């Protein structure tokens, strides 16, 4: 389950009156949960309406969870009945993941946020930087901690005790028993605000819906949304005195060939270094990029620094810090695409390597609360079998956007949005075939192979692959020639290329048109992020 605010329109035409909080859910067992058609939108409510309710979004979320899981037709109590192919079924479900960004959790939980004394919702012994408190009492660390063994994950019981303390302190203050200063100190030390009827303070949910255990700090916001990679990329640009115009030309002028699914965004990455995103002097004072843009940029920045920029020995520590961050992001994306096993221990080792490299180079000056959130991302890997993130929530917002943007009247806005989203989803479900399926309206069969379907595009574990995309199979690169479905299994017809040289640890040169055509299981393939001149395949 994920939730986030969304404002229909564009960056030049803001309409605060249409700011909508949307909540989406899916079932983890659904094959193809990475596709939008598998996600449902039961809640879309204007922020202005939420703000008029005592308890705001926190109370609204608590009421929804109670009704959805514990109500008269609750998924956790009596189940959800349905009929399929003349057979009756009942689905029972409980909350496993609750995904949002930091601001979303602040509104939903009453958490005081990343700038508070306790900047981590998941680890209760992490304190803000330069608090001068962690050394006074054993068991506490600050956000620059690089040792996961020193972290303490807050239990549900401990969190509920903190909520009870804040609620009681608020009640005593209202009765005049304690001062405002004491109340503020209690809220500061617990890292929570009191929200009447809110998620933390609703007794109906306790012991029945373990929502705190379901809190999922996602890697997308942690690394790519004013996050860890934003900081690290900016520091690398400054350390190596990178000319933004030179890098913009590198992105703009070379004939990069991106996968069809990312072609539009990939070909526009140069805009990150255009004049409108730089400071008044034309320098890079901040990485102004969306999460998807930064995800496409970091590998190209690494390649550019490796091949086009001198790296003197005195900047070796800066280089190690940047590449360790890139390696960490490489690993997370590989796990998400199921190319490598999901390992909590491996993720923690990579976070430790990066944090030691970063703090060893820069100290704690540039460490942000989101550096501590990396450990919260790792905590979920002990419980989950898939990598859940907010990318799907951002994509689902597009479904809401196409319905809400043209609306001029606010009368019954929520009903209009929800009915439109439901109708759109019903149409999408007509072509939904799971995590791995052929796409498009014209798959065809050959007379010699009547039970085999061929197509130009397929969906594979969250990836959109299309004919003429460059793909990887292990360490081999090649060109996708056709998409094939046979006996319920997806394959790619791939012309493998011949490697002719290593450029960097992440890029090789290849000779194309080898004639070595093979049938490869689609689940074993990966996308090449970008292809440069002379068939330079840059995997990450």
List each language-model region with its residue ranges.
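Charged (Asp/Glu and Lys/Arg) segments that form or flank catalytic channels of large polymer-
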Residues: 1-6, 65, 70-308, 312
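Structured nucleic-acid-interacting core domains from mobile-element enzymes and related host factors
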Residues: 1-17
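A generic structural signal for short coil/turn motifs at secondary-structure boundaries
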Residues: 10-12, 51-54, 309-312
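Catalytic cores of large soluble enzymes that bind and process phosphate-bearing ligands
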Residues: 56, 60, 112, 293, ...
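Terminal interaction-prone segments of large eukaryotic proteins
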Residues: 257, 263-540
């Amino acid at each position: 389950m994920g939730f986030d605010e969304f404002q229909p329109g564009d960056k030049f035409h803001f309409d605060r009156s249409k700011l909508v909080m949307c909540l989406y859910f899916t079932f983890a067992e659904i094959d193809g949960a990475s596709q939008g058609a598998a996600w449902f939108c039961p809640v879309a409510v204007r922020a202005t309406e939420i703000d008029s309710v005592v308890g705001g979004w926190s109370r609204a979320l608590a009421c929804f969870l109670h009704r959805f899981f514990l109500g008269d037709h609750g998924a956790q109590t009596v189940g959800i009945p349905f009929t399929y192919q003349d057979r009756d079924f009942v689905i029972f479900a409980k909350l496993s993941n609750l995904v949002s960004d930091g601001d979303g959790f602040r509104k939903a939980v009453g958490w005081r946020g990343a700038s508070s004394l306790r900047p981590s919702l998941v680890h209760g012994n992490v304190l803000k930087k330069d608090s001068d408190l962690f050394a006074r009492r054993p068991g506490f660390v600050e956000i620059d901690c690089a040792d996961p063994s020193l972290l303490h994950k807050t239990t549900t019981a401990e969190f509920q005790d903190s909520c009870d303390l804040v609620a009681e302190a608020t009640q005593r203050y209202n009765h005049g028993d304690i001062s405002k200063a004491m109340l503020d100190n209690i809220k500061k030390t617990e890292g929570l605000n009191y929200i009447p009827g809110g998620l933390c303070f609703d007794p109906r949910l306790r012991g029945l819906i373990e929502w705190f255990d379901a809190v999922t700090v996602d890697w997308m916001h942690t690394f790519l949304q004013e996050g860890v990679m934003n900081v690290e990329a900016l520091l690398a640009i400054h350390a190596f005195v990178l000319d933004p115009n030179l890098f913009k030309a590198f992105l703009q002028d070379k004939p990069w060939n991106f996968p069809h699914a990312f072609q539009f965004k990939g070909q526009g990455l140069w805009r990150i270094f255009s004049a409108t995103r730089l400071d008044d002097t034309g320098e890079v004072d901040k990485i102004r990029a969306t999460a998807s843009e930064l995800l496409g940029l970091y590998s190209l920045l690494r390649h550019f620094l490796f091949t086009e920029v001198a790296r003197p020995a005195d900047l070796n520590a800066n280089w190690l810090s940047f590449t360790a961050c890139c390696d960490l992001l490489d690993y997370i994306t590989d796990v998400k695409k199921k190319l490598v096993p999901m390992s909590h221990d491996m993720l923690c080792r990579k976070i430790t390597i990066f944090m030691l490299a970063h703090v060893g180079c820069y100290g704690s000056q540039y460490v942000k609360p989101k550096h501590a959130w990396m450990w919260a991302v790792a905590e979920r890997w002990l419980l989950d079998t898939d990598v859940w993130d907010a990318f799907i929530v951002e994509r689902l917002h597009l479904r809401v956007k196409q319905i809400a943007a043209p609306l001029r009247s606010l009368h019954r806005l929520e009903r209009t949005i929800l009915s439109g989203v439901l109708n759109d989803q019903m149409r999408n479900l007509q072509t939904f075939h799971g995590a791995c399926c052929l796409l498009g309206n014209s798959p065809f069969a050959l007379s010699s192979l009547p039970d085999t379907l061929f197509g130009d595009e397929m969906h594979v574990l969250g990836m959109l692959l299309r004919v003429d995309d460059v793909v990887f199979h292990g360490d081999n690169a090649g060109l996708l020639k056709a998409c094939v479905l046979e006996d319920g299994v997806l394959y790619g017809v791939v012309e493998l290329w011949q490697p002719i040289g290593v450029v960097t640890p992440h890029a090789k040169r290849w000779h194309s048109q080898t004639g070595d055509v093979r049938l490869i299981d689609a689940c074993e393939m990966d996308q090449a992020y970008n292809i440069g001149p002379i068939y330079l395949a840059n995997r990450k």
